[in-house]
Amino acid sequence: MSSGGLLLLLGLLTLWAELTPISGHDRPKFCYLPADPGECLAHMRSFYYDSESKKCKEFIYGGCHGNANKFPSRDKCRQTCGGK
């Protein structure tokens, strides 16, 4: 296969991976953790996946500790955990 064909295949696979919805079986376990603002006093706009509503929601992160269910953007939350 030519290098152009390989690039096209790679591009199509990447697009497919981005557009394929995440099922509950593929979702990382930390997506089911509750929002945890942590113990520090920073005021950082963050997002977490709410497994009950199946949506990425905004919360304020304090800047330290907390858990892995926090994302810098709604898009990153959706890419990792799915949701709306």
UniProtKB/Swiss-Prot annotation:
Statement: the UniProt record of this protein carries the keyword 4Fe-4S: no
Tissue and organ expression note: Expressed by the venom gland.
Originating organism: Daboia siamensis
Residues that span the membrane, as ranges: none
Protein name, as recorded: Kunitz-type serine protease inhibitor B1
Principal location: secreted
Signal peptide: 1-24
Cited Gene3D superfamilies: Pancreatic trypsin inhibitor Kunitz domain (4.10.410.10)
Residues marked Reactive bond for chymotrypsin (site): 41-42
Domain BPTI/Kunitz inhibitor: residue ranges: 31-81
Protein's job: Serine protease inhibitor that has activity against chymotrypsin (Ki=4.77 nM) but not against trypsin.
SUPFAM superfamilies linked: BPTI-like
GO molecular function: serine-type endopeptidase inhibitor activity
